[in-house]
């Protein structure tokens, strides 16, 4: 793994609720939802009377200094109409998305005119069930170490594909499934996105960060 192996971050040492840092959240919502199916991108699919994206924004709002929503131009008016129809007035700004997730996140980060030492968290638009406890742990860990991401242990068996033998089983305890929000010091993540090749095969923000910084990324257990 390219990440720090301190899996269970010690809440009793690093976290005091009264001094919990807040975070500038970036929500890339440009996906077309092909894996999910249906006529709409999955972030706009309704669950319990509201689009999933609204549930996601509500989940992070208590921990947010600001929220930047990244949307393709084609969906900005649609989203604004949804907000009017649902009387959804949670404060956020909209930034136009790029052709890829990488470019969308970079656009949003560049738009943040805030303290470069502030925390920025990048969270998927269709992860509304993130718990407050997980967010709090991530903010505390990132404030100390500079970078923190949530993970879950793998429960499925996994195999490594090999050209000559086809595949081989591997020890799944040596791997974890990474989730969001991924939280960083803004100045460092911004520098990583500026230096990174947008055509590289980055799978998340942590991989962009690692391309520039040889520094541990704290792993925080997710809900």
Regions found by a protein language model. Give the residues of each.
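Conserved alpha/beta core of the MobA/IspD/sugar-nucleotide pyrophosphorylase nucleotidyltransferase superfamily
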Residues: 21, 99, 176-223
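Conserved N-terminal catalytic core of the sugar/cofactor nucleotidyltransferase
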Residues: 6, 15-18, 54-117, 197
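A generic structural signal for short hydrophobic patches within well-formed alpha-helices
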Residues: 76, 135, 175, 189-190
